A protein has these predicted regions:
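A short helix-coil junction within the Rossmann-fold of NAD(P)-dependent oxidoreductases
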Residues: 79-80, 96-98, 124-133
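Short alpha-helical oligomerization interface
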Residues: 96-111
Length: 313
């Protein structure tokens, strides 16, 4: 059987790098989609040597740039006959950043990278995924969405294109959590729209994991100290990479779509209650997610905004 093709964004460090190594070791043809080609070339060689698999390719991609995504998808479809697995792993979180950062299309950088970029890539590669016998998409989510158990927490749809630039300070963690909540909402809608084409779409809720040196190097002094301290007890990225592999390849998830899966590989259910003790249980547990994610009005808002900004309607 011809090797299956897996595309992983942000595959040059952390979980993405570990996942690329896992898939390569298992004999898959791996396409690393990365922004920093200097670092990524060295990582690619490292993965080839460790996996004994020469079918590890590298393509340049900036997930925050729509132009880069369009160029990448065009080049990918010209080079590969199909796509079997698409993993939206790349993410943006600038720890402690107090200034709003915008993408080349003037979209808040967290949302451009974590939400609108994956949406556009999925839209452009859907026809190539459809050529696979068992196409699967996995979106990397986060436990940060648990902040939405607070009924006051909402995505600020009026602050995604620099509307408050220079008017108030940016909260990097809020924007990161909001963008990942939006990605989860897109997961459910993508699963619905792509189901007739046989494409399964799920999300993995990533909890604690040891941060890479590359990630820590970008932080300010305070966050560096905190990250190094947390790394003493955080598990290695390889554990979460194993989850990527299992969800995207095993028969257990062959017919699963439109689900959020936790680090124990259990399907998470929407919360039935977000008040009192139930809210505390939800925040510290891993069995439920905020029902904000399935509210049809919110889902329609982010879906329509994605179509409008990416001009894919």
């Amino acid at each position: 059987m011809e090797n299956k093709i897996v595309l992983i964004t942000g595959a040059n460090s952390g979980i993405g790098k570990a996942a690329a190594l896992k898939f390569a070791t298992e004999g898959y043809r791996v396409v690393m989609a990365c922004r920093n080609m200097v670092i990524s070339n060295a990582v690619r060689q490292e993965i080839i040597e460790a996996s004994k698999n020469v079918q590890v390719d590298l393509m340049e991609l900036d997930v925050s740039s729509f132009d880069s995504i369009r160029a990448f998808c065009s080049a990918f479809k010209a080079q590969y006959p199909r796509l079997d697995i698409l993993i939206h792993n790349a993410a943006y979180l600038n720890h402690g950043e107090k200034a709003f950062k915008l993408s080349p299309e003037n979209i808040e950088l967290s949302f451009a990278t974590n939400t609108f970029g994956p949406f556009l890539m999925t839209q452009l590669l859907a026809d190539h995924l459809e050529k696979s016998q068992d196409p699967r998409i996995l979106n990397a989510c986060t436990t940060n969405i648990k902040h939405f158990f607070d009924p006051k927490r909402k995505i600020d749809f009026d602050n995604l294109q620099g509307e408050l630039l220079g008017k108030q300070l940016n909260n990097a963690y809020t924007m990161y959590g909001d963008s990942k909540m939006a990605l989860l909402m897109l997961t459910f809608k993508m699963a619905e729209t792509l189901k007739p084409h046989g494409i399964k779409v799920n999300a993995l809720q990533i909890n604690r994991v040891k941060l890479s040196k590359e990630t820590i190097r970008k932080m300010n002094s305070f966050w560096k100290v905190l990250a190094w301290t947390q790394n003493l007890t955080n598990p290695l990225p390889s554990g979460m990479a194993d989850n990527y592999f299992h969800i995207c390849t095993s028969d257990e998830y062959k017919n699963v779509t439109g689900q959020l899966i936790n680090h124990k590989r259990q399907i998470i259910q929407p919360s039935t209650s977000e008040q009192g003790f139930s809210q505390v249980k939800n925040i510290f547990g891993s069995g439920s997610y905020p029902n904000y994610a399935t509210d049809p009005i919110n889902v329609k808002k982010i879906w329509d905004l994605c179509i409008s900004l990416t001009k894919t309607g």
